[in-house]
Regions:
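Conserved beta-strand elements of the Class I
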Residues: 29-31
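C-terminal accessory helical subdomains adjacent to catalytic cores in phosphodiester-
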Residues: 2-7, 13-27, 43-64, 78-92, ...
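Phosphate/oxyanion-binding active-site loops and adjacent basic polyanion-contact surfaces
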Residues: 34-38, 66-74, 209-213
Length: 235
């Protein structure tokens, strides 16, 4: 009897969740390589969008920290879509090259292209960074093209954050979104990232060093921010 009760409760929860999802016109499922840096950054977008009376009832943003690298990130995304019977939405895989093989870094993009041919209602996107998401953060302060080790990016951020009077850069900063928005320049970061990708046209993600496509997800989410916050991201 208890098992039956639990099953009915689970079915009720699934039904309520499905009803909740159907009300959301725009759905974003963000799968992050790490469990701290990337999720905390995108939680900033989520907070402001959910406070925006124009879009909060129309936009769904779910953020998962995968604690996994490259191909395992998209693998976990596929598993989530399958297990939760997701029928519509944008699936974003946010991952770093770090020291992983080029075949794995490029493989996420290739796998996304294959999956996108199967179902036009569920589209996968690769928001990669070479070498790491700190490169995207760094572009908020300067145009940078030197292919240095990722430790140099963190050193750069340390110096900038100390100049701003907020101490050292930490990977688990709760206010990383606000820090970059107020202390840096998101509009410039987007422009710089696009320029780097354009200059690397015809190259694979692993060959564009340094480089990042995180800006694509940023531009997508920025559409739903409150108007006064959008001004930090749009021309």
């Amino acid at each position: 009897m208890a098992k039956r009760g639990r099953k009915e409760k689970d079915n009720w929860k699934k039904k309520r969740r499905q009803e909740y999802l159907e009300k959301k016109e725009f759905r974003y499922y963000i799968f992050c390589e790490g469990q701290a840096t990337e999720p905390k950054y995108f939680q900033g977008f989520k907070r402001y969008i959910e406070d925006n009376p124009i879009y909060r009832d129309m936009v769904l943003i779910e953020i998962e920290g995968c604690q996994a690298e490259t191909m395992r990130v998209i693998g976990k995304a596929e598993e989530y879509v399958r297990e939760n019977k997701i029928t519509k939405g944008q699936i974003w895989c946010v991952y770093d090259k770090d020291s992983f093989p080029s075949s794995d870094v490029n493989g996420v993009v290739q796998r996304a292209e294959v999956l996108n041919q199967k179902n036009p209602d569920i589209q996968y996107h690769a928001a990669w960074s070479n070498e790491c998401i700190e490169f995207w953060f760094m572009l908020h302060f300067a145009y940078y093209t030197a292919n240095n080790h990722r430790s140099e990016y963190k050193k750069f951020l340390n110096e900038k954050f100390q100049e701003l009077g907020i101490g050292k850069y930490e990977k688990n900063m709760d206010d990383i979104f606000e820090t970059l928005m107020n202390g840096g320049n998101p509009k410039l970061a987007i422009r710089y990232a696009k320029r780097i990708i354009k200059n690397g046209e015809g190259k694979t993600p692993a060959e564009i060093a340094p480089g990042t496509k995180v800006y694509e997800l940023v531009e997508e989410l920025a559409k739903y921010l409150p108007e006064e916050i959008q001004t930090y991201f749009k021309k």
